[in-house]
A protein has these predicted regions:
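N-terminal amphipathic/hydrophobic interface segments
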Residues: 42-483
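A cross-taxon signal for low-complexity, glycine/charged-rich
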Residues: 1-7, 11, 22-29, 41
Length: 483
């Protein structure tokens, strides 16, 4: 009837020469005015509320209905039941009180008390909210649900969980149809083995992809490792993660050492790895990549390189150059320095067991008693063996040149320069005790009186002491900044 009367009014206006519409814009504006009530009613249907009893009231000039007992509110396919409802007729809203249950298709929302806004197709509660859509369960102190958008916004002590993942945050927006959640503030997501902490996080439930930003920390409870950074992408189906803004890897190793009274004392040893990009592959090889500007530090062991690959399953670390023209990786172990095109480190119970150096290798060791004296060896390949973290033997292959300072006890006793196709050097307490030359050996001895004060004259061509060794101070400084 309303629509019919609007059509007559429009015809009268158009046919009357006094009120004839002069242009198309005026005609469109007039149509919008005449039909606005009809369009509004179609987009926002009135809510209906029924129950066991009803009391009509005027509150501050506004018409209300209080409905008691077995209350049912409906709007389209949204159905709400509760103990009591106060309907604000002109506003198309209702206050819902007691055992509130909201349903639409597979979605169920429960709360002790809330509101429903008919014109917005929105429900809200700040009395504790529980949402279940048969895919996830979402709880919080307060929350809104927008039915036209299939979107939930929950605040304060938010918790979302499904069969594999639990997520907590201060705020969370859940897009039901997209199976997507955006969380803000003190965000934690846990899948039983890995935990991600961040200031903000976006999680796609179907694809199991997660993006995290600001104060990010990825913890693997299985191997007791953590990666800090400012941006993380985690692809759980692929078993792949990347942190590409200020990443720092930390792994704490607990070991026990025997003291003089034969009691075992616990000792914590932390592995630090810093780089521009870090990638982790959670497959059978358990690979970890540190890419570009890599720094490694663990007890007396340190390294600088372009690329580090850590095979956790095989207890093996490989460092390498990024290109043929790039700088060689550097490795320090106590008072020794090592360079080569690539360095492979074999671990045993988190301790270095063996080092393999390939391609234009150089090793130097500073003497403990005379810091001006360095034992030096250059070759094409090196294999170094360790016992209890100390060097015991080094095998050099391919055009080997060496300089070793000699000692009688702690008394300096000149040096020996030698070359051969292969060389074996034996160590004790990280000091050279014996040098063995194989295949076309040649050597020269220089007495102490020629050597004293002239140590810098006895250097191999590629000798250089590199001063950019990573330190605990810089690693802990970065860690404190990221925390």
């Amino acid at each position: 009837m309303k629509l019919f009367s609007n059509e007559i009014a429009l015809q009268n206006v158009i046919s009357n020469p006094i009120y004839r519409v002069r242009n198309l814009n005026q005609l469109l504006a007039l149509i919008l005015i005449l039909f606005s009530h009809t369009l509004f009613a179609q987009q926002n249907p009135l809510i209906t509320v029924i129950g066991d009893s009803l009391v009509g009231k005027m509150v501050s000039g506004e018409s209300t209905r209080e409905v008691y007992g077995n209350v049912v509110l409906t709007q389209g396919d949204v159905v709400i039941t509760c103990d009591k409802a106060i309907q604000f007729i002109s506003r198309n809203d209702a206050e819902l009180i007691g055992n509130v249950i909201v349903k639409k298709d597979t979605l169920t929302i429960k709360t002790p008390r809330g509101f429903y806004y008919g014109n917005l197709a929105k429900t809200r509660s700040n009395a504790g909210v529980y949402l279940d859509d048969k895919k996830v369960i979402l709880t919080a102190d307060s929350g809104d649900y927008f039915f036209n958008e299939d979107r939930a916004f929950f605040e304060s002590k938010v918790k979302l969980y499904d069969t594999t993942t639990t997520l907590t945050a201060n705020e969370l927006t859940y897009f039901q149809q997209q199976n997507r959640a955006v969380a803000i503030g003190d965000v934690v997501i846990f899948d039983g083995e890995n935990q991600i902490i961040a200031d903000t996080l976006e999680h796609f439930r179907n694809s199991k992809i997660t993006f995290a930003n600001s104060n990010v920390r990825l913890t693997n409870l299985k191997n007791n490792s953590e990666i800090y950074g400012e941006h993380l992408e985690d692809y759980r189906e692929r078993g792949y993660s990347i942190i590409d803004v200020t990443p720092l890897f930390i792994q704490v190793d607990t070991s026990y050492i025997e003291s003089e009274d034969s009691l075992k004392e616990m000792q914590l040893d932390t592995l630090f790895i810093k780089s521009r990009i870090m990638e982790a592959y959670r497959d059978s090889s358990q690979r970890f990549y540190a890419i570009d500007s890599v720094s490694i530090l663990k007890s007396e062991f340190a390294s600088k390189n372009d690329l580090t690959i850590f095979y956790r399953q095989d207890n093996k670390i490989i460092t390498a150059k990024a290109s043929e023209t790039a700088k060689q990786p550097i490795l320090w172990q106590e008072n020794s320095q090592l360079t080569g095109d690539s360095i492979t480190i074999y671990l045993d119970d988190n301790n270095i067991k063996q080092l393999d150096v390939d391609g234009t290798s150089f090793m130097l060791s500073q003497n403990e008693y005379n810091l001006e004296r360095y034992d030096q060896t250059s070759s094409s390949q090196i294999k170094i063996f360790f016992t209890d973290g100390k060097i015991t033997r080094a095998d050099f292959y391919g055009n080997v040149y060496s300089i070793y300072f000699m000692y009688d006890g702690e008394t300096a006793n000149g040096l020996t320069k030698s070359n051969s196709a292969e060389t074996t050097v034996l160590f004790e307490d990280n000091e050279v005790t014996e040098v063995k030359l194989y295949k076309n050996p040649a050597s020269e001895y220089y007495p102490e009186q020629q050597v004293t004060g002239n140590e810098k004259s006895y250097l191999l061509p590629r000798f250089v002491v590199l001063q950019n060794k990573p330190t605990k101070e810089e690693m802990y400084k970065l860690l404190n900044e990221l925390r």
